């Protein structure tokens, strides 16, 4: 049984990953941690989230003594923390010998020059960054198993790449157009006016400047036009993607490409049928639906995931299972 420490456990993603690890009989929780100045330190997880009343664990401050206890007692650490925090913690725990599953964007780009532009910091751990692998579970199994530094993908990239990667050899060089809508949990637990119930309405944000655009483009190997939207619902993502296919591509070719997911139990593909957010909420699944116009050569594919599950916590759990081979 592997022991897992969870840092940032008071947030939506941290609480969700805690529940998944607690329910896994191959894993045990070494401890739940929050920052030393967190207002949640000392509280139980159940007091913050009554839905997790069966998890009788308190949120401990991440002191230097706590970090050393994690190194001594845990096999791996999950970081459900901001990229500015994960940058340092991931390197520290990795260099101490633990497997690290980082849910932030601090290690998703192999190219260190991307970080000042998209995340606002210089990456100061090149030796750790060089070992990081991108934890897109259905596609990078061998790398996830071999590395102790796993950068769990973002929510929008997970939805988009799951839809697009099988099509890479069938697409033209024309940029795929991705319009994606996420529930407000994607903005985190901290109170903000623009994500409060009375303020939320369907609206685009981060237009032509969202940091998930280069993440998608890097992993796809092709530039994309990505426009995220905030939806007036709690959780879930629906990405609707338009792709120009190469001349001569048929429906049979597309169906054949998506057969790559026949051995992937969490990804289901439908032809001429499209998913809705409610189909995936509170599940680790990704549902894809596609339709092709052979006359004009355009494919529309919709991808639905739960942003807190497949887009974060359950994909981290997948990566843990892959890494520890069970």
UniProtKB/Swiss-Prot annotation:
Q: Which CDD domains does the protein's record reference?
A: AGPR_1_C (cd23934), AGPR_1_N (cd17895)
Q: Which PROSITE patterns match?
A: ARGC
Query: What is the active site of this protein?
Result: 155
Gene Ontology cellular-component annotations: cytoplasm
Q: In which pathway does it act?
A: Amino-acid biosynthesis; L-arginine biosynthesis; N(2)-acetyl-L-ornithine from L-glutamate: step 3/4
InterPro entries assigned to the protein according to its UniProt record, in alphabetical order: AGPR_AS, AGPR_type-1, NAD(P)-bd_dom_sf, NAGSA_dehydrogenase, Semialdehyde_DH_NAD-bd
Q: Could you tell me what this protein does?
A: Catalyzes the NADPH-dependent reduction of N-acetyl-5-glutamyl phosphate to yield N-acetyl-L-glutamate 5-semialdehyde.
Q: Which NCBIfam families does UniProt cross-reference here?
A: argC
Q: Where does it localize?
A: Cytoplasm
Recorded catalytic activity of this chain's protein: N-acetyl-L-glutamate 5-semialdehyde + phosphate + NADP(+) = N-acetyl-L-glutamyl 5-phosphate + NADPH + H(+)
**Would you tell me the protein name for this molecule?**
N-acetyl-gamma-glutamyl-phosphate reductase
The record's keywords, sorted A to Z, are: Amino-acid biosynthesis, Arginine biosynthesis, Cytoplasm, NADP, Oxidoreductase
HAMAP family the record matches: ArgC_type1
Protein family: Belongs to the NAGSA dehydrogenase family. Type 1 subfamily.
Name its GO BP terms in alphabetical order.
Answer: L-arginine biosynthetic process
Lineage, uppermost ranks: Bacteria, Pseudomonadati, Pseudomonadota, Gammaproteobacteria, Alteromonadales
- SMART domains in alphabetical order: Semialdhyde_dh
Instruction: Provide the GO MF annotations for this entry.
Output: N-acetyl-gamma-glutamyl-phosphate reductase activity; NAD binding; NADP+ binding
> What's the EC number here?
1.2.1.38
């Amino acid at each position: 049984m592997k022991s897992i420490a969870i840092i940032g456990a008071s947030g939506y993603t941290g609480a969700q990953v805690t529940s998944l690890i607690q329910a896994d009989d191959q894993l045990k929780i070494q401890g739940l941690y929050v920052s030393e100045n967190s207002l949640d330190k000392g509280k139980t997880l159940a007091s913050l989230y009554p839905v997790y009343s069966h998890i009788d664990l308190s949120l401990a401050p991440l002191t230097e003594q706590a970090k050393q206890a994690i190194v001594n007692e845990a096999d791996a650490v999950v970081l459900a923390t901001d990229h500015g925090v994960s940058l340092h913690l991931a390197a520290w725990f990795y260099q101490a010998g633990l497997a690290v599953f980082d849910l932030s964007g601090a290690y998703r780009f192999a190219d260190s020059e991307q970080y000042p532009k998209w995340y606002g910091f210089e990456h100061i751990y090149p030796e750790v960054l060089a070992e990081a692998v991108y934890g897109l579970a259905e596609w990078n199994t061998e790398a996830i198993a071999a590395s102790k530094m796993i950068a769990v993908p973002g929510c929008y990239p997970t939805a988009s790449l799951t839809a697009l990667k099988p099509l890479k050899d069938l697409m033209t060089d024309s940029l795929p157009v991705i319009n994606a809508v996420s529930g407000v949990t994607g903005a985190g637990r901290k109170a903000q006016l623009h994500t409060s119930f009375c303020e939320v309405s369907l609206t685009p944000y981060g237009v032509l400047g969202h940091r998930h655009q280069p993440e998608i483009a890097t992993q796809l190997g092709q530039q994309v036009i990505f426009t995220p939207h905030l939806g007036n619902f709690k959780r879930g993502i629906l990405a609707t993607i338009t792709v120009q296919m190469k001349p001569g591509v048929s429906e049979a070719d597309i169906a054949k490409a998506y057969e790559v997911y026949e051995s992937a139990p969490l990804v289901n593909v439908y032809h001429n049928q499209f998913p809705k957010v409610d189909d995936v909420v509170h599940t680790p699944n990704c549902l894809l639906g596609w339709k092709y116009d052979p006359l004009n050569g355009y494919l529309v594919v919709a991808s639905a995931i739960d942003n807190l599950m497949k887009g974060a916590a359950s994909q981290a759990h997948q990566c843990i299972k892959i890494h520890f081979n069970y």
